[in-house]
UniProtKB/Swiss-Prot annotation:
The gene is RHM1. It holds the Pfam family GDP_Man_Dehyd. It comes from Arabidopsis thaliana. Pathway: Carbohydrate biosynthesis. The increased accumulation of auxin in rol1-2 seedlings appears to be caused by a flavonol-induced modification of auxin transport. In bacteria, TDP-L-rhamnose is formed by the successive action of three different enzymes on TDP-D-glucose. In plants, on the other hand, a single polypeptide probably catalyzes all three reactions that lead to the conversion of UDP-D-glucose to UDP-L-rhamnose. It is found in: Cytoplasm, Cytosol. This is Trifunctional UDP-glucose 4,6-dehydratase/UDP-4-keto-6-deoxy-D-glucose 3,5-epimerase/UDP-4-keto-L-rhamnose-reductase RHM1. Its EC number is 4.2.1.76, 1.1.1.-, 5.1.3.-. In the N-terminal section; belongs to the NAD(P)-dependent epimerase/dehydratase family. dTDP-glucose dehydratase subfamily. GO terms for biological process: auxin export across the plasma membrane; cell differentiation; cell wall organization; flavonol biosynthetic process; regulation of cell population proliferation; UDP-rhamnose biosynthetic process. The active site is at residues 133-134, 159.
Amino acid sequence: MASYTPKNILITGAAGFIASHVANRLIRSYPDYKIVVLDKLDYCSNLKNLNPSKHSPNFKFVKGDIASADLVNHLLITEGIDTIMHFAAQTHVDNSFGNSFEFTKNNIYGTHVLLEACKVTGQIRRFIHVSTDEVYGETDEDALVGNHEASQLLPTNPYSATKAGAEMLVMAYGRSYGLPVITTRGNNVYGPNQFPEKLIPKFILLAMRGQVLPIHGDGSNVRSYLYCEDVAEAFEVVLHKGEVGHVYNIGTKKERRVNDVAKDICKLFNMDPEANIKFVDNRPFNDQRYFLDDQKLKKLGWSERTTWEEGLKKTMDWYTQNPEWWGDVSGALLPHPRMLMMPGGRHFDGSEDNSLAATLSEKPSQTHMVVPSQRSNGTPQKPSLKFLIYGKTGWIGGLLGKICDKQGIAYEYGKGRLEDRSSLLQDIQSVKPTHVFNSAGVTGRPNVDWCESHKTETIRANVAGTLTLADVCREHGLLMMNFATGCIFEYDDKHPEGSGIGFKEEDTPNFTGSFYSKTKAMVEELLKEYDNVCTLRVRMPISSDLNNPRNFITKISRYNKVVNIPNSMTVLDELLPISIEMAKRNLKGIWNFTNPGVVSHNEILEMYRDYINPEFKWANFTLEEQAKVIVAPRSNNEMDASKLKKEFPELLSIKESLIKYAYGPNKKT
């Protein structure tokens, strides 16, 4: 068949292990090809993997996510892409059991976005989809013939299931829309630049440190290994000679038991295998064997060139010469890693071409990424802000995102659940924030009475979850801005109603009437032990959105009867931007996060009548009467906001702020 010659190639995931070797090879060997690489720089990606290509005129790097349809469409059109080599994926099987939705998002949804962009632009002449041998499922131990390309797909874990699902989409777009697709399924790959979550680099780094090599189970599992440069050559052959609509296995019939791999690495380091190999608990999802038929690709002229001994020696030499390539990876070297540690540097030593990224920063994107253009004077840039926000579906969390958009601050919402430490670690590794905002938690719907009958759920979110996030942030040197509550106090003899004497930050909570307040007081006390937390005591939050049912104005304007009692309150339109400024100033400790002074519930409703609805009427009842229609008592108090006022002298009193931010903009003429 005729050889295919591309012009402009988009390689996704090209800062990762295999794709970086492919990109570097094509850039080096084909100077007439323009290579655009797209990578979101996940934990197992590293821009240094592309160092050999960074000065090449036919190379361009773009930081971004394949799940962003706007970005992908923009790249295809503006770069004139005619060929896509799609490597980007979550690939570590172990992680897929703890966070399979992330694998679905990256591996299936991300692939779907690419395919749809190809369909819409109508300019793609080749779409090479990179899959895995694991889609075939486990091979019988006594099988003499490997899985050929027409074999049934029987994935056994969430990772391989998402790769098989992505393949189905690729095949469907090929048949339904005539997209010129080719799929590859590869054996295990090893060599330089690989993140040490995989067996060979993990064992090499452990051996370099003189530590034992942990083997899951009895070590009889069999794998086939190919050296990275041989695999890069295989993709070069598939690119130029592969036939549209076909699948190609990239494999070898040479198999090795995990035991033998460990022994060979011990031999390279002159270590006694008997003393330095330790058998640990097996993984329940550790398939015994993957075996491929490799004849189809060989007919195109490819064959592996690097022997096992030669490849292993090259790999060992590279890791011993580059021990800090990935930074602190001690967490990945554990026998059963709970979650990987933060990898090392992400940037080239010199400046990067951010021209395209800077252009894209002006366009809407799903990742809220703002990439500043490079300075021309060569002075080092102050690290830009990037917030990780928990509580996306909540009122405060949603408002924080809008403020960040307005101020041009990069941010992402956390995907993990607060009580799931591993998912929080993955968020931090993925987002790499400068600050973390926590507005997540349980307040109860429609009100805090819900917490009285859902106590374990309330503890899980408000106590265990908040403490877990604080601890993870502390481990990573991150300031956590924690939105707490001032509903942990009630008027008492030292702070009588109407006295103007408010509760200070150092005062001990005295309100235990509701289970919600108990959990918030408990977690606030425990958070005092964390020096990386800024606790913001919010009370009866109010905003300019008078249609929001969580707005205190909206709440009481819909009540049949209202208790008339003065309280401290928080006007979010004024105070949420202040919380962002507090993060910039790295303020810590406890802060009464309310406007100075108090306002009674009747005064709020009087303003509502005067500004919004002249016909509005309401009735009052006593605390005793209120107690008959609610499950748990409510907190009423005055907070002393002098500490916040001293830090932000422009802070308005509660009544001034209500008029400026809530009632004034909504005034009915």
